[in-house]
Amino acid sequence: REAAYDEPDLVGLGERVERSVARELEGERFVTAVLAEIGADHEVVLLNYGHPAPMLVRRDGSVDFPEPPAFALPLGLSAHGRDGPEPYRVAFAPGEQLLLYTDGVTEARDRDGRFYPLGERTHLLKEPDAHRALERLREDLVQHTGGPPGDDAAMLLLRYHRHQEPGPGPG
C-alpha cells in the first residue's frame, strides 16, 4: 500500500509489489491479486495477477466479469520468466459498482457441491449502505455453504458516486 504513493503508474506499482512478494515468499508459494487504479475519466485500469476477474455491476443491473487480455502468473512467481500482466481499461461510470473478491467466494460450495453463484446475487448489492450490502452478500454466502466458507472469502465493494461540483464561494 505504501508503494502506491511512490510509483507513478500501475505497472510500476505492480513490479514493486512483485519484487516484495518474491522476497517474502519461499519456494513455490504465490499470491493472486488485482491492482486497480480509478481515475476521473470514467474508467478503471486493472492489473490482474492470476486473480478472479472483478464483478462489475452496471447501473441497469447487468453484470460483467472483465477478464484481462492475457493470463499472467500470480505474484511471487516472476522467477519463472514470464512477463507481468498487461493493464486493461474497463468503463466505470457513476452509479456502477465494482466487487473485488477472493476465489474463496466463487469456489464456496453448497452441500450438493454447487459453486456460489456470485453473478446471480447482484440484487443483494442494491442496499444503499455499502457496508450493509457486503454484509448481506456475506450472509448469503454463509447460507449457501451452510456455515463459514472453507477458504478465505474476502470482498471489497467500490461504488462510483457522482462528483458534486463545488458551489459558489462565499461572497
Which functions belong to the PLM regions below?
Residues 1-171:
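Conserved subregion of the PPM/PP2C metallophosphatase catalytic domain
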